[in-house]
Each structure stands twice: as C-alpha cells, then as structure tokens.
C-alpha cells in the first residue's frame, strides 16, 4: 500500500537536502552521483526504486504530520523539533553522521563582524563553546538529538 510507504521530510531547501542525504545513507533512495549538501538536492533529483511517497512539509510540522500518519510511515525530523514533540531520539532508526557532509555544512557557527574575530572576548567565547564541558553538556542534555561536531 502506498500509504505504508510514505516518508515525510522538511520542505525548506537545507533541511530537504539533509533529509534526502540521510535517506540515501540508509539505502532508501539514490541521489545523483556526487550529490552533496552544499549543492542542494530536491525530491525531483532522486531515484526512488522502492516507490516511497515522499511528502514535503514545513520543518516545524514534520513531527505532528508523522504522529498523524498511517502505520508504516517514516519521517526525517530535525532534532530540535523531535525533542519539542517529546520523541525519544534513542529510538530513531537512523541519525545524521556528525562527521558527514550535511552535518558539517549546516552546523551552527559563531559569526562576528569583520575585524572582531581576534578580540579577546570573542576568542574566550569560542574557546568556551568548544570546551569539553560544553560538549559533555550537549551530549547529556540532548541525548543525540543535537550533536557537537567540534
């Protein structure tokens, strides 16, 4: 049945690409040779031999759409939205590889005005953010839903 083969993913450019890369990582679809997070891919680019019905919705609605979907459906849900929906990340069938192309491309960054990058307070902030204490906090607090890539 088609409804049992639905995969719900975020519709915005960056998260759609990330979702499709994850689905390819898990062998559910194929993307064009050399597809990567920086170039961006959409559902129009995929090879879908399994016949999944891939539905794109706003990222902040994926968890709710998934909760209301038929048995057998899958969803690719951003960690922050999965947490907000009360989902147990440890039960995820797949997670994005923290060292992978998508995670590295879409990681949060510290951006400062040009010329301020070497200010002592900026350097102190960067050092603190990259500390083992912060990494441990992220790992303990978010249990895999948010991953420190530093």
Would you name each region that the model predicts?
Residues 2-3:
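Short, small-residue-biased leader/transition segments that mark boundaries at the very start
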Residues 7-13, 32, 96:
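Short beta-strand->loop
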Residues 11-14, 34, 113-117:
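Short coil/turn segments
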Residues 15-19, 62, 118-121, 125, ...:
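Stable alpha-helical elements in mature extracytoplasmic
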Residues 18-24, 83, 87-127, 129-150:
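Periplasmic-binding protein-like
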Residues 20-22, 43-82:
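Short helices/loops that flank or line small-molecule/ion binding pockets
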Residues 29-48:
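Short mixed-charge
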